[in-house]
Amino acid sequence: MLLPHFKKSVLALCLFPSILYAADTAPTVTLNPITVQAEGNWLDEANAQKVLNHAGARTVIQRDELINRGATSVKEALRTVPGIQAPENAGTAGSDASLSIGVRGLTSRFSPRSQVLVDGVPLSFAPYGQSQLSLAPTSLGNIESIDVVRGAGSVRFGPQNVGGIINFNSRTIPETFAGTVDLTTEIAENGHVKFSPNLFVGGTLDNGLGLALLYSGVNGEGFRDKNDDSDINDIRLKAAYAIDEYAKIEANLHRYDADVDMPGGLTPAQFAENPYQSLRNHDYMKGHRTDGSVKYSYKKDDNAFELLAYHTDTFRDAGMERSGSKLYQTAPRNYKVTAIEPRYSHAYQLGTTENEVSVGYRYLHETSEEAVNRASYNTVTGPTNEYAWTKADGKTDAHALFIDNRTDVGAWSLIPGVRFEKIKTTENMYKLNKDASVLNGVHTEKSYDAVLPSFSVMYKANDLWNIFANYGKSFAPLQYSQMANTNASGAYLTMQGLQPEKANNYEIGTHYLDPYLSLEFTLFYIDFSDELKRDDATQTYSNLGATEHKGAEFGFKYNLGAISDELSGISLYANTTYTKATASAGENKGQDLDFYSQLVGNAGIDYKIDQWTLNTNFYGQSGQTASGTHDATGRYGNIPGYGLVGIRASYDFSNTQLNGLKVGFGVKNLFDREYYTRSADQVGGMYVGAPQTYYLQTSFDF
């Protein structure tokens, strides 16, 4: 039984500061009164100081950094974070509406192993039953900062957190009326143009009510010759009301719509002929999401309380030709999620120690409705005579409880914690006749109870430098798609023999922060047992057995003003990650995993003089492999490494007749380096990367 072990864990956690106090044999001294302050939810108001005080690997990127680096998508923004790999669009993940990121060698397709949030609300359709981002309902233009917690976060946020927590913070409501209108225009080598318009306007009234309207879009053609259009609209309405100086209520209402083409992969012969062509004229991804959230927060002295409630309603559909057949397939899906999350933190003193205990609970209910339809297909007329193939419905009820306690003893901080997950998932899968009547069906359900301990320790060498180490256990339930499937004969169960994913994460590292230099260095090790591996060609899963991921991350930002005031306009940044990700059991033991680079890095220089800002940046990654029997489709084989250089110049018209106007011009892939990736899924093939691309940024603040 897991529950008795859970009770023992909680009891030990609660007694932990008392044990430290009892063990303190130092002489009694008179101390000045100390005011303890509860921190509460440490995802709130993420900044460099919070990174310094976090006992794990963590990186926060602010909006101005993203602009200076010329990032025009969330994928490009995340590439600047140590440990993250964000591949080019490929396969069924081949659209601007999807998001694929892999952390520390973990699989990147649709970001399945990181808990991705927007303002604390899960971004995925269904956090437990379908934790993927084939539709990622967020846009870079509406983001204030990106907070990437790679270690020491699993106890508070889960499941699906072996790859850490990524929280996109939307733009904050200004204290006074203000707004920005901006437009980024990208021009590809083939003359195709893509526009990214953004609007932000808001302010706070004298009575404490704040309102803001955010809009971000992507409209136009990509760099492929055909079937590469994007039409994305992302709008968010935010409200906040300060009840008094300690309490406030915040609300979000959000709508996201996307209709994007997927140009598809090429065989090696087609790629050699023209890597930018598209021979799949009817593949697409479309969808929409409506969501709302309300949060009440209270913080006064030693107490902090937060209550978050949210509801999401997501629809997505993808249509694509099935390679090697004369069939076309669509996959409409609907998901609804409702959740409530109370959290409470209390700071207290016990003898010479300062403590903060935090407890939280979440109840989440999600439902799914999934279907697959097929049609006859040829490349000229497209799909015709659509008929039903399968349908499925599922639901999950999940309870999660966490408790952790931070104890500060001199220069040391000790943070034990435990998370308890109780999950029940059901799935009904039906094979349909062409007229949508049921041929046969199967029903399955699975329940999970998991106790997930964590422990972090941090040593404060001084006010600028911390050293940390941590351990955390993560857990991921089976997804709806892993529980049952169909073939031409009927529906059948696929979960026999499959085990939930479990992983042990270890880190040791350091943070440094002063007015001129910020630095991070982390050694990591992930012991991933019972990792589920997807066979993209057959769309089935198996327990690979185990994988291990180990490596090192290093990053810094440095302002040369530390050397001389005359150099204060020059800033440098760089980060690099070395990862070794291998199978540690089974027939592939010792072999590298697919679709990850052992070495990834980026660097840049920012130079500001008067009203000019000049930027240059570099991104590079080593080669990858897509293991499998080489064939004419291009699915399998080596993927060469590459490096890309970008430049940008901008001018701020402040203190002129055009006050508020900013204009920037840049070039991505300056030397027009040709590179590619592969996809081993049902679409498959080779995918060329973005060629030399020019972009123009214009914005006006009012």
Question: Positions of the model-derived regions?
Answer:
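Gram-negative outer-membrane beta-barrel transporters
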Residues: Y344-A347, G351-E354, D408-L414, K422-I423, ...
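Extracytoplasmic beta-strand/coil segments of soluble accessory domains associated
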Residues: L43, K50, K75, R79-P122
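Transmembrane beta-barrel wall of Gram-negative outer-membrane proteins
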Residues: T180, G191-P263, Y284-K295, H346, ...
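N-terminal periplasmic accessory domains that precede
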Residues: V74-A77, S100-G105, S114-D119, L133-S139, ...
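Structural signature of Gram-negative outer-membrane beta-barrels, strongest in the C-terminal barrel
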Residues: D244-Y246, L253, A347-E366, A392-D527, ...
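Outer-membrane beta-barrel domain signature, especially the mid-to-C-terminal portions
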Residues: A318-M320, T390, M429, V438-K446, ...
